[in-house]
């Protein structure tokens, strides 16, 4: 399952900057309206199914990849990917009055973190900070700054 930009804070920050992004890349409206909102709704559905399984006593393992654009050095980007994953875990912990928190604490919900940094980024994205269009504001650059839920596994014991 591919889900990017899933936290309300990211949505809010991107939507607040939509006008700035559109100055550089005027065709981003579809991304803001369809992709961001659609992926957030997918995430809520996934959370609903996960919560139902956890409440039935099932144990789950969630595999989450973190990515970054190539704008900074490799080590920085790996750490940035880790922070993105941690932001997701923090959001999960606080979701709907901390519904997932007891399952995270008890180990019934385990998060497997897979930080990739810039290693999977497309060559279309510039690593030159002076090339703001291709390093920050292009759709390709935006899509590099993400996390992906790649698997939700039911753990049999």
Model-derived features: where do they sit?
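Short loop/turn segments at strand-loop or loop-helix junctions that form parts
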Residues: 1, 64-69
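Periplasmic OmpA/Pal-like peptidoglycan-binding modules at the C-termini of bacterial envelope proteins
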Residues: 2-4, 9, 15-23, 41, ...
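Conserved, compact domain cores that house catalytic/ligand-binding motifs in diverse enzymes
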Residues: 13-14, 33
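Extracytoplasmic/secreted proteins, especially bacterial periplasmic and envelope-associated proteins
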Residues: 27, 34-49, 75, 79, ...
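A mature extracytoplasmic/lumenal domain signature
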Residues: 66-68, 81-84, 115-117, 151-153
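Short, solvent-exposed loop/turn segments at secondary-structure junctions
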Residues: 70-74
């Amino acid at each position: 399952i591919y889900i990017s930009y899933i936290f309300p804070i990211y949505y809010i920050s991107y939507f607040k900057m939509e006008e700035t992004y559109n100055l550089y890349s005027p065709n981003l409206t579809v991304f803001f309206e369809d992709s961001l909102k659609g992926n957030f709704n997918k995430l809520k559905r996934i959370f609903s199914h996960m919560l139902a399984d956890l409440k039935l006593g099932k144990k789950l393992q969630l595999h989450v990849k973190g990515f970054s654009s190539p704008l900074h050095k490799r080590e920085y980007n790996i750490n940035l990917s880790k922070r993105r994953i941690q932001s997701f875990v923090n959001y999960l912990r606080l979701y709907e009055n901390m519904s997932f928190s007891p399952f995270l604490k008890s180990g019934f919900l385990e998060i497997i973190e897979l930080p990739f940094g810039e290693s999977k980024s497309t060559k279309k994205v510039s690593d030159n900070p002076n090339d703001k269009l291709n390093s920050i504001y292009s759709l390709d650059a935006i899509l590099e700054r993400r996390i992906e839920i790649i698997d939700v596994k039911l753990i049999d014991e």
